[in-house]
């Protein structure tokens, strides 16, 4: 199965560049090589235990941020009009609000560059809580998009339904794991496709075959439904199952650990950055866990590791 996956294609999907580790330039190949990691500088809030409070705060927060960011305001207004036409024909999960759908349409509209700005901010915006509060310009959009994926995917992670196989590629960057078996995060909102043929039309430098537990199918809400997109949140932890080189192409298989890890939780409400990335099951998202339960689960996970049980990321 793994070998078959790695032989899939020689020119594969490239939706958006992801960033997770140290970069170096290889002048002999004319490409950037980037090592995958747990992406410690990512803003990775999953809003565990505070999603309802954030729903209340985000309304005014979005207005404030749109007033300070012209492209955000224009993109949101365009998506809002499109959403009003699209929403009538959709069957949406309980709790799914218009803002969640609009956020997805904002993100998938590649006619503007807002998705790139958002992901650049996500990749680098988690250096500190103070930096997030002062300089992260998409707090409301990040919340709405994160919450949309949680609601569309549903609770329970892979305990509720099996890992979903998707494909993703990146042009101009060769992503490399430090070793097979590493735990890594993609470190941004990462687009992928259910359709390998679609995936192979987007790039060739790095090809990922992924099995995700928290990626959500957004085809019905996307500006480009024909891409059969599955959007993966920044906090999902993957294990590198296999890696190979085929000429100047990197081929990698990632399998979800069915865990998320976050340095941040409810940051906008005052929760500071944790010194280590705390692991909890993917099923414990939104308000299904309290903030206290999130911390307790994380502490127990680390304790089990010290007793010699398997912990994803222990070798990093």
From Swiss-Prot:
Sites where a glycan is attached: 68, 109, 242, 248
Main location: secreted
A Gene Ontology molecular function term of the record: nucleotidyltransferase activity
Occurrences of domain TR mART core (ranges): 70-261
Subcellular location: Secreted; Membrane
Binding site for NAD(+): 107, 168, 188, 222
GO CC annotations on file: extracellular region; membrane
Protein known as: Ecto-ADP-ribosyltransferase 5
Species assigned in the record: Bos taurus (Bovine)
Protein encoded by which gene: ART5
